[in-house]
Design a protein with these regions (language model features):
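Conserved DHp (HisKA) dimerization/phosphotransfer helix of two-component histidine kinases, i.e.
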Residues: 1-13
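Helix-loop-beta hinge of the Bergerat
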Residues: 8, 17-58, 64, 68, ...
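A short, flexible helix-to-loop-to-beta junction within the catalytic ATP-binding CA
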Residues: 15, 39, 75-80, 107, ...
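ATP phosphate-binding glycine-rich loop and adjacent ATP-lid/helix-beta elements
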Residues: 31, 107-135, 142-150
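Conserved transmitter core of two-component histidine kinases
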Residues: 40-47, 96, 128-132
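Short beta-strand element(s) in the Bergerat
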Residues: 56, 93-97, 143-145
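Short beta-strand/loop element within the Bergerat-fold HATPase_c
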Residues: 79-92, 96-100
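Glycine-rich G1-box
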Residues: 104
Length: 153
């Protein structure tokens, strides 16, 4: 039922239900709270600008959702961190979304549909998405992963 209601809301142009009951920071907190546990700790440090356009909010929420889903499905991480804020690079102000984990890393595997979808949504807003190791390989060969999206404001 929830998925059907969500699909109807998206078709009607209302955006995700998570954004209809509170602001983006609250939606992100609810998402992180729902994903915490099961041997994994996720920290959230979210300071998005207050006046983001709805399409940008949707991309932020979907990017974090997919990154956390990838962590749960593929990384064997015990810790993750979601950081959202703004940076100014010269005359350009950017919204920065960084999701980092201490898991196995990508191991050079090709990009799947989840990452491709994230990249497509971010690039549609004129932004970039990078996926890199979070650190040098440890004794087990794990590198963790950092997914960073940058969207011009």
């Amino acid at each position: 039922r929830d998925n059907l209601a969500e699909a109807r809301a998206l078709v009607a142009g209302e955006g995700p239900s998570a954004l209809r009951s509170g602001d983006l920071a609250q939606a992100l907190q609810r998402l992180v709270d729902a994903r915490n546990g099961s041997g994994r700790s996720i920290d959230l440090d979210a300071h998005p600008p207050q006046a983001l356009a709805r399409p940008v909010e949707v991309v932020v929420l979907r990017t974090v959702q997919e990154a956390l889903s990838n962590i749960a499905r593929h990384s064997r991480a015990t810790q993750a961190q979601v950081v959202i804020g703004t940076e100014r690079l010269g005359a350009v102000r950017e919204l920065v979304i960084a999701v980092t984990d201490d898991g196995t890393g990508t191991g050079g595997r090709p990009e799947g549909t989840g990452l491709a979808g994230m990249r497509s949504r971010v690039e549609a807003l004129g932004g970039t998405l990078t996926v890199d190791p979070a650190h040098a390989p440890d004794a087990d060969g794990s590198t963790g992963t950092v997914i960073e999206a940058r969207i011009p404001l």
